[in-house]
């Protein structure tokens, strides 16, 4: 079970999560491992920093500092969990669990529980919106359960033709009350023509709604948009995403003789998004990992496209949103086509990316396309930066005057005012 290499097995302990349970620790560990398999989720180890030095030599294990999704790894078909226990009488026990077959698992697209509650507050005008806001405030202050209130206000929102809707979001009673306090002035300012109101938490109101007949558009940004820690809680909130992993394997089969992958964990670049280490990484170390990610264009592109597929699935299957319009830019067109199912096999994309020289030699690495265009010799600019992109915050006309004086400087993108 532990013979894999390259940090293949996560380790943790129940004591770190819930404290010392004494004689009940064995049962608590069994429950934790079972829940990990059921939810396909690896919980983080709180307050972890580093192991004792003698444990650092092995490379089979890692400690998840933050919780993360548990994806099927290359060569595997199911997940396994092991429990080791030592009783007060020094008797050791060891138990290995495996997840149930996919056909026996209950399909759940959206998790029914979570930290955040969402409150849609409807009204025909400013006074009725503010009254609904005050009603929610009174309900919370009287001790009513926030989750039950969220369900109540959601049901009300489905059966009204009110023109305006304020949406509040929060994890605790205190957070929601703070959102209400901020919304009072925000809603009034919006009705006064001072623009839409939004909070850092995600609460929102506009006095200029698009109406119920408005169409939905999906926008796909540049393909190179992934980053370390991207989408960490997505699988936990939307368990149905795990079915995509099985879908890729069933539809494409093993990628034996190809350089591409049909495993979601590899297409998503899981190990880059959620690093596996025995020690807690510093901000400087995380920045270095992100810098390496940015300079690995194939990995970055595969991860960006895969993330777009996951988020599109969430919008369509989790929220029931179907776009009437979709568009992508800066290679986001690729994400759009895969995300909306126009193209099927992402493993074929992976194979092409990993066998083509486009992102390994032509536009990245030695950048031979640039060398040929500029007629550079093989040894020129080997130890210097050959190509760089910069953002300049001055007028287009000023930039163009300077660009015209240079042989190898180009104005390639102009943002709108």
Q: Where on the chain are the PLM-derived regions?
A:
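FabD-like malonyl-/acyl-CoA
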Residues: 123, 170, 196-400
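Flexible catalytic loop/linker elements that gate and position reactive groups at enzyme active sites
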Residues: 55-57, 62, 76-215, 226, ...
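Flexible, glycine/charged-enriched surface loops at secondary-structure junctions
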Residues: 43-45, 142-152, 192-197, 256-266, ...
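Short beta-strand
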Residues: 157-159, 326-328, 409-415
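Acyl-CoA/ACP chain-elongation machinery
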Residues: 1-67, 84-86, 110-120, 127, ...
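Conserved phosphate/anionic-ligand binding catalytic regions in large, soluble enzymes, centered on
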Residues: 20-37, 82-97, 220-229, 326, ...
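Short, intrinsically disordered, charge-balanced linker/junction segments flanking boundaries
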Residues: 54-57, 412-417
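Catalytic-loop motifs flanking and including active-site residues across diverse enzymes
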Residues: 22-29, 93, 128, 303-311, ...
């Amino acid at each position: 079970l532990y013979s894999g290499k390259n940090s293949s097995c996560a380790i943790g302990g129940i004591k770190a999560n819930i404290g010392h349970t004494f004689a009940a620790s064995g049962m608590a560990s069994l429950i934790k491992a079972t829940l990990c398999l059921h939810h396909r989720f690896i919980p983080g180890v709180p307050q972890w920093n580093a192991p004792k030095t003698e444990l650092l030599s092995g490379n089979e294990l890692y400690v998840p500092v933050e919780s993360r999704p548990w994806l099927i790894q290359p060569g595997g078909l199911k997940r396994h969990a092991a429990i080791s226990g030592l009783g007060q009488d020094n008797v050791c026990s060891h138990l290995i669990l495996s997840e149930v077959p996919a056909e026996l698992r209950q399909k759940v697209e959206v998790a029914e529980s979570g930290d955040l509650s969402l409150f849609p507050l409807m009204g025909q005008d400013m006074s009725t919106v503010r009254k609904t806001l005050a009603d929610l405030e009174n309900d919370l202050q009287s001790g009513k359960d926030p989750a039950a209130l969220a369900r109540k206000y959601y049901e009300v929102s489905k059966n009204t033709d009110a023109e305006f809707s304020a949406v509040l979001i929060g994890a605790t009673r205190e957070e929601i009350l703070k959102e209400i306090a901020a919304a009072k002035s925000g809603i009034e300012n919006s009705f006064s023509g001072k623009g839409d109101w939004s909070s850092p938490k995600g609460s929102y109101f506009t006095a200029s709604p698009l109406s119920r007949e408005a169409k939905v558009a999906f926008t796909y940004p540049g393909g190179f948009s992934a980053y370390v820690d991207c989408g960490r809680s997505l699988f936990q909130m939307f368990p149905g995403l795990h079915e995509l992993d099985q879908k890729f394997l069933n539809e494409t089969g093993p990628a034996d003789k190809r350089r591409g992958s049909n495993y979601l964990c590899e297409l998503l670049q899981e190990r880059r998004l959620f690093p596996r280490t025995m020690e807690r990484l510093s901000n400087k170390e995380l920045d270095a990992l992100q810098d390496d990610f940015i300079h690995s264009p194939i990995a970055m592109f595969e991860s960006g496209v895969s993330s777009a597929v996951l988020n599109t699935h969430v919008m369509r299957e989790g929220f029931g949103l179907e776009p009437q319009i979709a568009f992508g830019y800066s290679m986001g067109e690729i994400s759009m086509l895969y995300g909306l199912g126009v193209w099927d096999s992402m493993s074929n994309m992976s194979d092409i990316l990993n066998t083509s020289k486009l992102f390994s030699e032509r536009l990245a690495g030695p950048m031979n396309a640039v060398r040929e265009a500029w007629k550079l010799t093989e040894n020129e600019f080997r130890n210097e930066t050959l190509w760089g992109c910069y953002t300049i915050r001055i007028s287009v006309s000023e930039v163009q005057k300077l660009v015209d004086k240079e042989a190898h400087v180009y104005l390639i993108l102009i943002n709108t005012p």
